Amino acid sequence: MLLGSVPQLDRVAIQLGPFPVYWYGIIIGTGVLLGLWLATREGERLGIPKDTFVDLVLIAVPIAILFARMYYVIFEWEYYAQNPSQIINIRQGGLAIHGGLIGAVITGILFAKRRGVSFWKLADIAAPSILLGQAIGRWGNFMNQEAHGDEVTRQFLEGLHLPDFIINQMYIDGVYYHPTFLYESLWNFAGVILLLALRKVNLRRGELFFTYLIWYSIGRFFVEGLRTDSLMLGPLRIAQVMSIGLVVISVIFIIVRRKMGQADKRYLEN
């Protein structure tokens, strides 16, 4: 596709008759599958049957998508109240990660209770997978030319030594923008490496998951400050408020669980 003489990538991957298949969905799906592979591999090593995470994903992913969409729609209600038919249209984005995380955690707690396994054990195993999915998923935002930052010059982007396909895709309606999707994606990939390394440290059960929440939230807080499409509540960026809250809650949970003797088991224990 050409836009203002700057070559750009088409958000539609393939056309199946009258039905377009968007890169956004393909990329999100890829993130889910790779995350599932990573979790089942580690789960088997720690005595968790392979079908446990397959079953969890089949339940948690639809619920997470539902919560992610509900979260987004709630904070953009002024638009969706006037365009109710668009509420279910997620083909071109409009999923809020924090909403999806809330849905996934609720599902995980109920699933673990029903299966008679430790939620914290499942959460620890899944933590790198969740972050990997988020790192990959941000490239769906890239294809949709959304979740970007403020205006910049092409010279600025070239100064970051980015490949042309990224620079060109950040050219929207005659203006270049901060590739905030890339900043967050790289931060998340670094977090995946950190979490995989911390598996060998044998942290107390639950603390790998809290480390994920802290790491992701720190990166999201700073990246969100660069974005121009933040969900707002008055003067506050919702994602920044949530990020601060998750860091504080995670630290409190780590301290309280240790003091109350609820974190005696280690990551590698059955």
UniProtKB/Swiss-Prot annotation:
Compartment(s): Cell membrane
Gene Ontology biological process terms in this record: lipoprotein biosynthetic process
Statement: the UniProt record of this protein carries the keyword Transmembrane helix: yes
Record membrane topology: Multi-pass membrane protein
Binding-site residues, a 1,2-diacyl-sn-glycero-3-phospho-(1'-sn-glycerol): R138
Superkingdom: Bacteria
UniProt GO MF annotations: phosphatidylglycerol-prolipoprotein diacylglyceryl transferase activity
The name this protein goes by in its record: Phosphatidylglycerol--prolipoprotein diacylglyceryl transferase 1
Organism of provenance: Bacillus cereus (strain ATCC 10987 / NRS 248)
Gene that encodes it: lgt1
